[in-house]
Amino acid sequence: MTTSPLANPTATRELLEEFGLATKHRLGQNFLIDNHVIERICELAELAGDERVLEVGPGCGTLTLALLQEAACVTSIEADPELEPVLDAHAADYANFRFIMGDALKVTPEQIEQAAGGEPTVFVANLPYNVAATIILQFFQTMPALKRAVVMVQREVADRIAATPGNKTYGGYTAKLGLYAQVTGRFEVPPRCFMPAPHVDSAVVRIDRVEGVAPEELDREFVARVIDAAFAQRRKTIRNSMSANGFAKDVLDAAFEDCGIAPTTRAETLDVAAFVRLAQELIHDA
């Protein structure tokens, strides 16, 4: 059973007061104060002790201290410079902890690899909700050694990540993430598990990398372009949406016929495999 000494209101408040800190709503910080949630996150992550874990938004280190008990090393990225002294104190206590100060969307994979002593293999985080979806997709796109992610996100984001074709929350983001990974686990987290309590509900999702979704030789950025064009005008047919966003109608018609996709189809009914097939046909004319 993995717990954190900071996962309660008193310990979190005392640590913040020790360093003269108040919560920073502008950075989306709501500190996790429930050890049951910490335990479930660690269980879902299935850490065996040899992983290089990447974390974003460690805050005061509540989840970090639990992960350090389970992983070979933990590398955290924190945007708030006022939290640097707190993380420095943790680094002094744990030889397997290192951190990078900066914006997770701007820190390069090379910087992360250098800090971690190798490519990260697992991503575990209580993510800043305003950038969570973007971070998840970007990390799977740019870090090929990343096997899985276990992340806390706003419930609506979790719904988007896990959506299936035909569901109203299924969209271009879901399909693009599906080129790299799929959801394999989830549990809900109520607002009372945080300090201060957020005004939204949260969920933890596990996302595992999948192989073989698209042929290695197929440019996934082109597949993403196809997906974006298909969803650009969601209420229109896929033919009308894509023809208004960079694809010629005659080329589209030939590709639809070869793929067995009706031009009157709407993008939200197609799975990732269908977009891959469509991209394979269209890339010859790109």
Regions found by a protein language model. Name each.
Residues 1-228, 257, 268, 277-284:
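Catalytic cores of RNA-modifying enzymes
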Residues 209, 227-286:
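C-terminal lobe and adjacent flexible extensions of AdoMet/dcAdoMet transferase-like proteins
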